[in-house]
Amino acid sequence: MALRFGNALFEPLWRRESIANIQITLAEQLGVGTRGAFYDGTGALRDMIQNHALQLLTMIAMEPPASNDADAIRDEKLKVLRALKPFTRESVARDVVRGQYRAGMCGGHPVPGYLEEVKVPPDSACETFVALRTEVQNWRWAGVPFYLRTGKRLAARDAQIVVNFRPVPHQIFPGASLPNRLVIKLQPEDGLELQLLAHKGTGPGEQLTPVSLDLDFDKAFATQRVGAYERLLLDAIAGRLNLFVRSDEQEQAWRWVEPILDAWAEDGNGPRAYAAGSWGPAAASALVARDGFAWAEEQ
């Protein structure tokens, strides 16, 4: 919110003409631990996509609210949820990947697969990973793919939003193929990274090299920022509702994910296996590659 609506720099670029795709990743290295019984009745879609990932999407895609009032903000977020491209049985098969982790190495240590976790049924079809493609069907975002991804036992603990900009319309420098990228870091660091192209100036030629402008908020403010849960508790005590979800937002989010759950209930194939310590099933990479893009860690 502060990045978008407190700074004039990005607003002229925050639209389909300048942005190629947006990626939202909520990755965990941990498994289900002792929560196997609870998690098996929930899964990654309900646990993370329906709420956390969609809330991040709405804040990235929303129109500027008329004020910093909670309802003004939530009205705009609701418009985004209503503009999300609805899923059909066919589009779920094409645009949604679900996975389940198997035994592997995570954080340098061997870990069991999901089916070997405590209180998890040995024949469970519960998903521990979801990657999906969607679009916001309005004038600002028409045609821009939004990729959402979450999972357990992945290669790193990483929560971030990656805004990939379009390349320049006419390239005059040789070999300059990487477009600009803005990375909004949420966990484990809290900061921003803007990736640009620049000339090294160390020799002949005009070859451009990727460089990053990296901002760590803790270092910039010379203090550790309040954590996400602490921030919510402080806002609740103060009666500030800007970050809290309104009931109509919640209902619309459930309407959007329900067709995915219904399609999975009729699909006998179950989730795709992926090794603990990886970035999920290969189909998740193929999902993005189909549009000519790649996940941030693959570029």
Task: Indicate where each model-derived feature is located.
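Secretory/organelle targeting and membrane-embedding segments
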Residues: M1-Q299
